[in-house]
């Protein structure tokens, strides 16, 4: 929004031209989202407490989690508000890249809100019925997939980028829609499964978003994209604003979500942020890289799949409890140890993912 105002004011004072630089607006976007989260966080937590919107803890969960019962939840609203305000202020609202991610955040955030509402108000620990949740996610993801396929403006927008191989970029054709669908829905649910300990999901989300900010900048710059053998995506640089807004809002939220948490993000936050990461990965054509950098999310999801599959096929469990972070809790690891070690793994995987940009 302010981009257009600055563009108009440039004719009176050339100093306003600084707002045309993506990097400058990205910094302001990060700071805006973070300051908003830090400022509004205490007010929102107090309001949630008054409204008795507290976490509902499963009776079959780890005993250490029983003390979390009643902790304010649905704090993801704080993150989403920070991202939206920041992007609307500093982003180029003429960019379809920006609106795609905002649409994903809004729709998946709404799905998560409905899920949280059922848990908190109706005291139903299962929340929204799984098939309805999956159906709503599927509709939203397919809308985005079809739109991106139909509106593709260059061959690079529907290619598959394979890390480590600079000459392998196959055109996906109609399979593009399938890939987009599974990337967005899968990423959304993976982050949701990871959000089981204080700060466990938000920090890897911040790291991956920061990495995608760099990748979006490189992909939107013709010289950098050519040098690194990335698809050149004109306008993709505006995704940097979205990514840094997620980083800023996420760090601001972490201030209150770090152990012991004062507030949880709830499904309204985890489903939306996961879907947003998936959408960003699709937009910059780095779905495989998301699997690498978001390895912690993948690990959590695979642990659930293996646990359920093993129990149904053999009647035995592989882990003491899934997702896998609960397994380590039941092994006696203190919660902060599990969280920080998963953060370290996430940092390593993000750096590995960034290294693949050069290792081609």
Curated annotation (Swiss-Prot):
<feature type="transmembrane region" description="Helical">
    <location>
        <begin position="74"/>
        <end position="94"/>
    </location>
</feature>
<keyword id="KW-0997">Cell inner membrane</keyword>
<dbReference type="GO" id="GO:0051992">
    <property type="term" value="F:UDP-N-acetylmuramoyl-L-alanyl-D-glutamyl-meso-2,6-diaminopimelyl-D-alanyl-D-alanine:undecaprenyl-phosphate transferase activity"/>
</dbReference>
<keyword id="KW-0132">Cell division</keyword>
<keyword id="KW-0472">Membrane</keyword>
<keyword id="KW-1133">Transmembrane helix</keyword>
<dbReference type="GO" id="GO:0008360">
    <property type="term" value="P:regulation of cell shape"/>
</dbReference>
<keyword id="KW-0812">Transmembrane</keyword>
<dbReference type="Pfam" id="PF00953">
    <property type="entry name" value="Glycos_transf_4"/>
</dbReference>
<feature type="transmembrane region" description="Helical">
    <location>
        <begin position="263"/>
        <end position="283"/>
    </location>
</feature>
<dbReference type="GO" id="GO:0071555">
    <property type="term" value="P:cell wall organization"/>
</dbReference>
<feature type="transmembrane region" description="Helical">
    <location>
        <begin position="132"/>
        <end position="152"/>
    </location>
</feature>
<feature type="transmembrane region" description="Helical">
    <location>
        <begin position="26"/>
        <end position="46"/>
    </location>
</feature>
<keyword id="KW-0808">Transferase</keyword>
<protein>
    <recommendedName>
        <fullName>Phospho-N-acetylmuramoyl-pentapeptide-transferase</fullName>
        <ecNumber>2.7.8.13</ecNumber>
    </recommendedName>
</protein>
<dbReference type="GO" id="GO:0005886">
    <property type="term" value="C:plasma membrane"/>
</dbReference>
<comment type="function">
    <text>Catalyzes the initial step of the lipid cycle reactions in the biosynthesis of the cell wall peptidoglycan: transfers peptidoglycan precursor phospho-MurNAc-pentapeptide from UDP-MurNAc-pentapeptide onto the lipid carrier undecaprenyl phosphate, yielding undecaprenyl-pyrophosphoryl-MurNAc-pentapeptide, known as lipid I.</text>
</comment>
<feature type="transmembrane region" description="Helical">
    <location>
        <begin position="168"/>
        <end position="188"/>
    </location>
</feature>
<dbReference type="InterPro" id="IPR018480">
    <property type="entry name" value="PNAcMuramoyl-5peptid_Trfase_CS"/>
</dbReference>
<feature type="transmembrane region" description="Helical">
    <location>
        <begin position="288"/>
        <end position="308"/>
    </location>
</feature>
<keyword id="KW-0479">Metal-binding</keyword>
<keyword id="KW-0133">Cell shape</keyword>
<keyword id="KW-0573">Peptidoglycan synthesis</keyword>
<feature type="transmembrane region" description="Helical">
    <location>
        <begin position="236"/>
        <end position="256"/>
    </location>
</feature>
<feature type="transmembrane region" description="Helical">
    <location>
        <begin position="199"/>
        <end position="219"/>
    </location>
</feature>
<dbReference type="InterPro" id="IPR000715">
    <property type="entry name" value="Glycosyl_transferase_4"/>
</dbReference>
<dbReference type="InterPro" id="IPR003524">
    <property type="entry name" value="PNAcMuramoyl-5peptid_Trfase"/>
</dbReference>
<feature type="transmembrane region" description="Helical">
    <location>
        <begin position="338"/>
        <end position="358"/>
    </location>
</feature>
<dbReference type="GO" id="GO:0008963">
    <property type="term" value="F:phospho-N-acetylmuramoyl-pentapeptide-transferase activity"/>
</dbReference>
<comment type="pathway">
    <text>Cell wall biogenesis; peptidoglycan biosynthesis.</text>
</comment>
<dbReference type="GO" id="GO:0046872">
    <property type="term" value="F:metal ion binding"/>
</dbReference>
<dbReference type="GO" id="GO:0009252">
    <property type="term" value="P:peptidoglycan biosynthetic process"/>
</dbReference>
<keyword id="KW-0131">Cell cycle</keyword>
<dbReference type="GO" id="GO:0051301">
    <property type="term" value="P:cell division"/>
</dbReference>
<keyword id="KW-0460">Magnesium</keyword>
<feature type="transmembrane region" description="Helical">
    <location>
        <begin position="97"/>
        <end position="117"/>
    </location>
</feature>
<keyword id="KW-0961">Cell wall biogenesis/degradation</keyword>
<comment type="similarity">
    <text>Belongs to the glycosyltransferase 4 family. MraY subfamily.</text>
</comment>
<dbReference type="Pfam" id="PF10555">
    <property type="entry name" value="MraY_sig1"/>
</dbReference>
<keyword id="KW-1003">Cell membrane</keyword>
